[in-house]
Amino acid sequence: MAKNVIKRIFPKLDSVKEEKILKVFGPAVLQPNLWHINKKSVSRGFAIGAFCAFLPIPGIQMILAAFLSITFAANLPLAVILTWITNPFTYIPIVYFAIKIGGIFINAEFTYEIKNEQINIFTDLMQYWEPLFLGSFILSIISSLLSYILIRMYWRYYVIKTWSKRKKF
């Protein structure tokens, strides 16, 4: 199962205690349940990571995911790693899709024309901040709910499958 792979990849709590950068969060980051791999913490971690990934706040997504993980006792490493769904390669298509989605709800049409002069996408996008934020929030909610439900369903399926194999022996 993916649980065993994740356990091998993720750091152990003892090694986390020695990391200087994590001391900023204080003793809250050292709660053992933030580092355990179980159905509740993994599904919460996926939901938080997916939620933060689609918010249009690059650079702050990981900090927000860490804070929400501590608040809701979710798997901290998973939540932080999943914020990288939006990375330098995927950010522009996700922003475009978020603006399109937001535009549908507030009846704003999005047309972007690339000029031959200087391309400054972020300055040009400021005129579309309303559909961007609304669309990003909608994508965040949908992706977090879907990831939470799908992880819970997969976990249940895997446990049932494992138990049925044990019964055969």
Predicted regions and their residues:
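Transmembrane alpha-helical segments and their cytosolic interface motifs
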Residues: W35-Q61
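Membrane-water interface at transmembrane helix exits
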Residues: G49, S69, A98-I106, S147-V159
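Hydrophobic residues within alpha-helical transmembrane segments
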Residues: A47, F51, I81-I85, L134, ...
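Alpha-helical membrane-protein architecture signal
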Residues: S43-A47, L78, M126, E130
